C-alpha cells in the first residue's frame, strides 16, 4: 500500500542491448535510460499552476543550508546562489528533497539567497528568500 498523504518516487531503468551482428564494421550502441516516475495520490493533487515550492525553508547550518520541504511533494533543487543568475548557472550539487523531510547542502551563506528548482513541466523557476535569525523563507510573488 502506497502512502496517500505524499508522493512516492519510482525509478524505471531500461537497458537496450542490440543483438550481436555477424556483419563486419558495424557500429553498435547500447543505451541505458533511467526515468523518474512520481505517484501522486488523489488526496494531494494540486490545482494547475499552484506553486508549493515556495513553502521551502532554508536553515543556516554548518557550512551551508538545510533545505526543509514541509510539502507532500518531491522537489528537485538545481541551484542556490546570491543572485538569480548565479542560482541558475552556478556550481551546485543537485539534490532532490523528499516530502516532509530535509537535506543538508554545502554552500556559501547569502544575505538574500536565490534557489532554482525544476517544476512539474521541466521549467526552472527561481525563488527569492529572505532570512531572519538563521531561517530563510521564500518571498511570495
Feature roles, as predicted:
Residues 1-2, 86-114:
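Intrinsically disordered, low-complexity Pro/Gly/Ser/Thr-rich segments with frequent PxxP/GP/PP motifs
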Residues 2-40, 112-141:
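Terminal connector regions
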Residues 31, 50-52, 61, 89, ...:
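Residues that act as N-cap/strand-start positions at coil-to-secondary-structure junctions
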Residues 36-38, 57-59, 66, 96, ...:
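Generic structural detector for well-ordered beta-strands
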Residues 42-60:
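Low-complexity, acidic Ser/Thr/Pro/Gly-rich terminal tails and inter-domain linkers that flank the onset
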Residues 65-71:
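Asparagine-centered strand-capping/turn motif at beta-strand->loop junctions
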Residues 72-77:
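Short acidic/proline- and small/hydrophobic-mixed sequence motifs that coincide with surface turns
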Amino acid at each position: 500500500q502506497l502512502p496517500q498523504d505524499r508522493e512516492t518516487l519510482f525509478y524505471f531503468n531500461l537497458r537496450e542491448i542490440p543483438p550481436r551482428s555477424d556483419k563486419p564494421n558495424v557500429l553498435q550502441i547500447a543505451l541505458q535510460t533511467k526515468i523518474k516516475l512520481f505517484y501522486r495520490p488523489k488526496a494531494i493533487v494540486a490545482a494547475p499552476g499552484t506553486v508549493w515550492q515556495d513553502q521551502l525553508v532554508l536553515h543556516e547550518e554548518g557550512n551551508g543550508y538545510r533545505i526543509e520541504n514541509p510539502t507532500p511533494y518531491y522537489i528537485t533543487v538545481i541551484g542556490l546562489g546570491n543572485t538569480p543568475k548565479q542560482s541558475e548557472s552556478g556550481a551546485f550539487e543537485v539534490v532532490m528533497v523528499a516530502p516532509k523531510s530535509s537535506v543538508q547542502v554545502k554552500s556559501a551563506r547569502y544575505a538574500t539567497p536565490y534557489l532554482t528548482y525544476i517544476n512539474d513541466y521541466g521549467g526552472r523557476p527561481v525563488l527569492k528568500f529572505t532570512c531572519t535569525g538563521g531561517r530563510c523563507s521564500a518571498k511570495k510573488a
